[in-house]
């Protein structure tokens, strides 16, 4: 082999070596680009997953709020229906109270004649029937004589001094009060002690 042939072979071998190095460098750069691209894709996928998780959490929260609101509406409706049942006769019972008052006033008078006594007994039975019907429907009588005055249950009509009783004690009842299922229909009209 001549020198020139050796030189050509060496040049070709250098060219092959250089080409191999360039190719390796290109592959390395291309691999880095591919790795960077995969990392970017991974980051984007993570961001998308995070956004979807946030949306899912928001929808869950909205669903829970809607469920709670529906439960509150249901409970409120049940309470309203229950109150309508309990207090539906309130107006009716208020209108009956003057009738009871009139009957009770009539019964306070003493009667001597035998016929009048029989009539009084009939009125007493009528009054008892009326009171029983009201009780059956949840109307309770308030006759607070001797109790402490409570402005939620009683209406003070007059005050009198009486050293035998403590202040704010109910001395007398002008007109009985009535409650319907725990709610005041009419406050008792009373005289209280004020020393």
Swiss-Prot record:
Name the PROSITE patterns on file. Answer: GRPE
* Any one of the GO CC terms: cytosol
Q: Which compartments does it reside in?
A: Cytoplasm
Q: Gene3D superfamilies, per this entry?
A: 3.90.20.20, Head domain of nucleotide exchange factor GrpE
UniProt superkingdom: Bacteria
Q: Name the UniProt key words of this record, in alphabetical order.
A: Chaperone, Cytoplasm, Stress response
The answer on whether this UniProt entry bears the keyword Chaperone reads yes
Instruction: Quote one Gene Ontology molecular function term.
Output: adenyl-nucleotide exchange factor activity
Primary subcellular site in the record, as a coarse category: cytoplasm
HAMAP family linked: GrpE
**Record function comment:** Participates actively in the response to hyperosmotic and heat shock by preventing the aggregation of stress-denatured proteins, in association with DnaK and GrpE. It is the nucleotide exchange factor for DnaK and may function as a thermosensor. Unfolded proteins bind initially to DnaJ; upon interaction with the DnaJ-bound protein, DnaK hydrolyzes its bound ATP, resulting in the formation of a stable complex. GrpE releases ADP from DnaK; ATP binding to DnaK triggers the release of the substrate protein, thus completing the reaction cycle.
Tell me the PANTHER family matching this sequence.
Answer: GRPE PROTEIN (PTHR21237), GRPE PROTEIN HOMOLOG, MITOCHONDRIAL (PTHR21237:SF23)
Q: What is this protein called?
A: Protein GrpE
Query: What is the originating organism of this protein?
Result: Francisella tularensis subsp. tularensis (strain SCHU S4 / Schu 4)
What phylogenetic lineage does the species belong to? Bacteria, Pseudomonadati, Pseudomonadota, Gammaproteobacteria, Thiotrichales
């Amino acid at each position: 082999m001549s020198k020139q042939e050796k030189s050509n072979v060496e040049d070709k071998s250098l060219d092959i070596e250089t080409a191999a190095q360039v190719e390796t460098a290109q592959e390395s750069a291309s691999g880095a680009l591919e790795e960077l691209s995969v990392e970017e894709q991974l980051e984007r996928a993570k961001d998308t997953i995070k956004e979807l998780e946030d949306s899912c959490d928001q929808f869950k929260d909205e669903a829970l709020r809607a469920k709670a609101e529906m439960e509150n509406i249901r409970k409120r409706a049940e309470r309203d229906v229950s109150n309508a049942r309990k207090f539906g006769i309130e107006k009716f019972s208020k209108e009956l109270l003057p009738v009871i008052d009139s009957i009770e006033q009539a019964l306070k008078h003493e009667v001597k004649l035998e016929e009048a006594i029989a009539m009084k007994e009939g009125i007493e039975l009528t009054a008892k029937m009326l009171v029983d019907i009201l009780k059956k429907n949840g109307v309770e009588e308030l006759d607070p004589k001797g109790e402490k005055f409570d402005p939620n249950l009683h209406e003070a009509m007059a005050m009198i001094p009486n050293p035998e009783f403590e202040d704010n004690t109910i001395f007398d009842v002008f007109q009985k009060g009535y409650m319907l299922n725990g709610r005041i229909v009419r406050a008792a009209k009373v005289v209280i002690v004020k020393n």
